[in-house]
Amino acid sequence: MKKSFLTLLVILFSTSLLAHEPPNFNSKDNCRKKLSMLQGISKLKGYDGGEIIKFNSYTGFDQRTVLIDGHLNNPIEITGYLRLPEGTGKVPIVIYTHSSGGPGDYVWDDFVYHAAQNLIKEGIGVMYIDNFCPRGARSTWRDQSKVPLINGAIDALMALKVLQSHPRSNGKFGTTGHSRGGTNSFFVSDIKLTSKFLDGTKGFHAILPEAAECRMAGFFAKPELTSNTKMLVVHGGADDYTLAKFCKEHAERIKAPPGKVKIDIKEGWYHVWHAGKKPWREKMAMTLHDCPDFYVDNDGRFTNPTWVEWMVNKHKKYASEDAFYEAAQENPSKAWKTGFKIMKKEKCISKGVTIGGDNMDVYMPQFINFFKENLL
């Protein structure tokens, strides 16, 4: 009986039942600082009928720049695209932030497309966010120095603030994303960050990070879950791009009531396990596995002294740690690039990973049911 029920779920949420052929979409022509890729995506077959929403956000360097309000020095306009179920009733909304592949994920990633279609079919709205084009990038997978990691999380929180007053929002929100998008999901689960944007201790109701970067993102060393949140951490056990071990360890460190945070490591699955084809070698994808770990204390300062030693004493990029944080507030993108230049000199940056897998239909029911159970 149980096996039959699981089979039914797989059939119900099967991607093969929802025809989708990635369109011939020119991301270069549709992505500029003054033109979000979502403008073009909203006109494609299968994506039309939604609402373009532009909202104010900020560009920061890391969590410390947010804690000390340094991000307020760098306002930016961000574009989101909201797709809602038919009708006029109020619904929950899942906010998607994209991977290092950029907002083109929403077009070319079959799983992202089908997941959104299934959520909408179940009565849950979806908002895509373009974290890159306004910041002068289309993708970052070859060069992660282009856009600081924290900014996808800032955008997601600013989008949540805007959607709280949307006439069709019922006040319940989820968020998800893969890789860099999954990293954003981890960021917004911590009360120390979310409380800078939202009132009180509450944040997203349901958070599902996939294949996040947990060792090099600048997460709090002592994380604490927002009070209203259920979280499901999913990672491929064979992932050599973003390593599962560190996300499992970080999730286990999160201060939260029992049962609020669940971890599912999929043995044998690689990064982008729902790509719809067999794993392949991506030679140009950047990794930082040999660099010193990057976590911060509750004040947002480095917990690993190697970073200050490199920036201040060895490479003399800044006169002091405080001078670095001051520079990071004024020009976060420049400070981020400076950090990558130091890592290149230290020869701790590598390239080459295995990505892909044909696990869409196996994974889809788990993904959809997590949001149904926690938002509907």
Q: Whereabouts are the PLM-identified features?
A:
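Alpha/beta-hydrolase fold nucleophile elbow
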Residues: 168-179
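C-terminal catalytic histidine-bearing segment of alpha/beta-hydrolase fold enzymes
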Residues: 260-376
